[in-house]
Amino acid sequence: MNAIAARITGMQHIGLPTNDIDATIAFYQTLGFELASTCELPENKVAFLKLKNICIETYQSKDEPNAKGYDGAIDHICVDVDDIEATLEAVKAAGLKPMADEIEFLPFWEKGIRFFKVLDPNNAPVEFCQIL
């Protein structure tokens, strides 16, 4: 197992942009997902829905409807990590370039998250996330 794989503890979430966050929440609740958390950021409304070990982050832009350009887009994948700094070091050591210069923070969940992203070969962001 390589140094990056050793840090990953599981899949964190799948990010789904939406034009109607309320309808999206209702749809996934119909499938049995529970609304786990919501957050309002300056540019987006965000909701996390969970079912067993599956987590979906759905978000709606306040300014631009359909900001990603098409309906049904999966915007990024995210994996849980147990130590964000050690993971960043392992990612850099593997020759991957983080999209931002520093580990970022968002006020999700109870105490927030710290995260960084890299691009896969198709330019899809892969996020590494530590829930605080």
Positions of the model-derived regions?
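Core segments of cupin and vicinal oxygen chelate
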Residues: 16-56, 109
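Short amphipathic alpha-helices in soluble, non-transmembrane regions
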Residues: 29-30, 90-94
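N-terminal beta-strand motif that seeds the catalytic metal site of vicinal oxygen chelate
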Residues: 1-22, 74-77, 129-132
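Vicinal oxygen chelate
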Residues: 1-5, 92-132
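Helix-adjacent hinge/juxtasegments
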Residues: 67-80
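Helix N-cap motif at beta-to-alpha junctions
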Residues: 20-21, 82-85
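Exposed loop/turn and edge beta-strand positions of beta-sandwich/beta-sheet ligand-binding modules
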Residues: 10, 43-45, 73, 109-112
